[in-house]
């Protein structure tokens, strides 16, 4: 890692001096058994592509000017996450469904850092995801409509209550002796 990635205070902190909050398991700390429910997502549209050797994973990357990206986000009144999610969904729609049509929705998993939502300082892995599900239409859909649908789902799903239910489901399986 590059030395500039850390603040002077972080570099001065000796290894092994973590606080209890930094090493606490956020999943178990915020586990509420009564909130458990089963999560079932509808079948999603599958992108087809070249098969990789030995089941390898393909990762697409892109570089873009941050100022231009932020300007686009402001134009739509969206966060960067909302804008990029809408752009990916719209790209899938434009590329694959305009010519073929599809019966299944576009489904995008968006990773979410749970630390600010639950107010925890754990340095352990503490994340979940929200699933944005967009039904596909057989007609042209403007980007603005996709953006509004994405923003609406972010507002509905990016809540503490939603993630408490997911944590109860996930951490519950860890506490279940049969699993």
List each model region and its residues.
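Sequence-level detector for tyrosine residue identity
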Residues: 6, 15, 27, 31, ...
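Gly/Ser/Thr-rich phosphate-binding loops and adjoining beta-strand/alpha-helix segments
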Residues: 45-115
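Generic detection of long, well-ordered alpha-helical segments
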Residues: 13, 17, 21, 82, ...
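Generic structural signal for individual residues within well-ordered alpha-helical segments
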Residues: 6-7, 12, 70, 84-85, ...
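Acyl-thioester-dependent acyl-group transfer interface
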Residues: 61, 70, 93-179
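Short acidic/histidine-centered micro-motifs embedded in hydrophobic/aromatic stretches
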Residues: 3, 86-89, 169
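Alpha-helix initiation/capping motif
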Residues: 7, 12-16, 65, 79, ...
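Non-catalytic, low-complexity flexible loops and terminal extensions
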Residues: 2-67
